[in-house]
From Swiss-Prot:
This protein's name: 7-methyl-GTP pyrophosphatase
NCBIfam families (alphabetical): maf
Domain of life according to the entry: Bacteria
Record bears the keyword Transport: no
Taxonomic source organism: Burkholderia orbicola (strain AU 1054)
Length: 210
């Protein structure tokens, strides 16, 4: 009897972020990682939400274009933009800039836009969503902020604090519809998108998806 099992498309995470990869691994589903080659500079006059959504979609489509998959692929693109005092804030890159960020945000609120795109090459359809998270920082002595930075070196994250680690001690409150959005990959939104794309999240064994 011929094999009539409809196999799901290959799933790809379009990201170089180890944080997003770790989040996706929580789902226990097979996926590959391909880093997108993309200019992530915001466009003039672009809102934070528009920047995040544009880049999430561009990452997914750029990676999909490099994959030779006759049966199609599902590509996950994600981008996060943080705003403070009406301005986008990027990854600090250095200890000095990270400390300046944290000092300026003490007792204040920072808004994070975590955009997600699931691109289906079989239909050329892209599902997109922007999850907004509001984070209020505690007021702490500069010496403690400096000690935190030296302990966790969060120089590759916007806002200079890793909420999934010791950085949670810098925060007073987090308001979001998706607790994983702040780390960079909104899993509630993603699983909703995967279900809409008929991806078998609840296959009983990994072999069912092979």
């Amino acid at each position: 009897m011929p094999d009539t099992v409809c196999r799901p498309p290959r799933l790809i995470l379009a990201s170089s972020s180890r944080y997003r990869r770790a989040l996706l691994e929580r789902l226990g589903i097979p996926f590959d990682v391909v880093s997108p080659d993309l200019d992530e500079t915001p466009l003039a006059g672009e809102t934070p939400a528009a920047t995040a959504l544009r880049l999430a979609g561009a990452k997914a489509r750029a990676v999909a274009a490099t994959i030779d998959a006759p049966d199609g692929v599902l590509v996950i693109g994600s981008d996060q933009v943080a705003t403070f005092d009406g301005h986008q804030i990027g990854k600090p890159g250095t200890h000095e800039r990270a400390l300046a960020q944290l000092v300026s945000m003490q007792g204040r609120e920072v808004e994070f836009h975590s955009a997600l795109c699931l691109y289906d090459s079989r239909t050329d359809n892209a599902q997109v969503e922007d999850i907004v998270t509001h984070v209020r920082f505690r007021s702490l002595p500069e010496a403690e902020l400096d000690a935190y930075l030296r302990a966790e070196t969060p120089y590759d994250v916007a806002g200079s604090a890793k909420s999934e680690g010791l950085g949670i001690a810098l925060l007073d409150a987090i308001d979001s519809d998706d607790p994983t959005a702040l780390v960079g990959l909104p899993l509630i939104a993603l699983t909703r998108m995967l279900r809409a794309a008929d991806y078998p999240l609840f296959a009983t064994t990994r072999g069912d998806r092979a």
